[in-house]
Amino acid sequence: MQVDDFIERWLGSGGSEMATAQSFAIELTELLGVPRPNVSDKDGDFLDYRFERPVTLTHTGRKRNGRIDLYKKGHFILEAKQFVSPETKDKNTLEMFLEKDAPKQTGHGKRGTSKFDDTMMKARNQADNYARAVAKEDGWPPFLMVVDVGHVIELYADFSGQGQGYN
């Protein structure tokens, strides 16, 4: 797949993170020419490169479970979100009447809004918390990626190995 084909294919994505994030990540790895994530074994062991890597988060002495959207030990944590583009077309009354009544998926909200910015920052904090959780066993990953599937890949790096300066 060529870069332009990849962009065109994913530009229209929106609404459902669960339905798009893993396919997007697999196609991105193919585009970059790197191996795909591993398949978890029957025991669900923590593989070094996998989707939905379980982690235990500890905050103020309380523990809760989480799952990293995509994790590669010693390389990165990817946290995916899915937003929708704001509609640009003005609809007339007839078009609105003829639309199906089924609700549209809105994902985490509309791109280009303050909610988009807030949610992407929360996703960045979520990835940082995941990094803190895996650092105990695996060390700090040098990269955190926050993705709005098909539209934005925000990359934060900390090469110190301390997890204190993801910028």
Model segments located where?
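A short, conserved, highly charged catalytic patch centered on acidic carboxylates
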Residues: 1-143, 152, 159-162
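Charged, structured surface patches that assemble and position nucleic-acid processing machinery
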Residues: 146-147
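Glycine-rich phosphate-binding loops of NTPases
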Residues: 163-167
